[in-house]
Structure formats: structure tokens, C-alpha cells
């Protein structure tokens, strides 16, 4: 359970932003989306390799 302490006089918008940040860090939504459909392990590995190559290319261009 995510708990966000709200200080006296603190803006609700700020507290909501903290909650959203903590919620995203837990990865619940990402996990739920990934579990909606089964992917074969071979497909998962292939996608992971493709992402790694893409990120590596971006880093090379950045340097």
C-alpha cells in the first residue's frame, strides 16, 4: 500500500504528484499491461535484444 504523508498546509496537487511518482516506481501498471497477453520467452528475448541495440545506437550518436 502506498502512503503519502501530507504536511499541514501542503497543496493537494503536490501530494497527488508525489503519489503518482511513487505509484509509477512500483511498476504495477506496467506489470498489469504485460500480463494481459502472454509472450513466448523467445519473443521476449528478441525484443530485449532489439531494445538494447537501439539504446546503444542512441548512446553512440549522443557521444
Curated annotation (Swiss-Prot):
Instruction: Extract one GO molecular function annotation from the record.
Output: structural constituent of ribosome
Q: Which GO terms describe its biological process?
A: translation
Keyword list, A-Z: Ribonucleoprotein, Ribosomal protein
* GO cellular component terms listed in the entry, alphabetical order: ribonucleoprotein complex; ribosome
Superkingdom in the source lineage: Bacteria
Note the Gene3D superfamilies from the entry: Ribosomal protein S8
- Ribosomal protein recorded as keyword: yes
Q: Identify its protein family.
A: Belongs to the bacterial ribosomal protein bS21 family.
Report what the protein is called.
Small ribosomal subunit protein bS21
From the broadest rank down, the organism's phylogenetic lineage runs: Bacteria, Pseudomonadati, Bacteroidota, Bacteroidia, Bacteroidales
Amino acid at each position: 500500500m502506498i502512503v503519502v504523508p501530507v504536511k499541514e498546509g501542503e497543496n493537494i496537487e503536490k501530494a497527488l504528484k508525489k503519489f503518482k511518482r511513487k505509484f509509477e516506481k512500483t511498476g504495477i501498471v506496467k506489470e498489469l499491461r504485460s500480463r494481459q497477453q502472454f509472450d513466448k520467452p523467445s519473443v521476449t528475448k528478441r525484443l530485449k535484444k532489439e531494445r538494447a541495440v537501439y539504446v546503444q545506437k542512441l548512446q553512440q550518436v549522443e557521444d
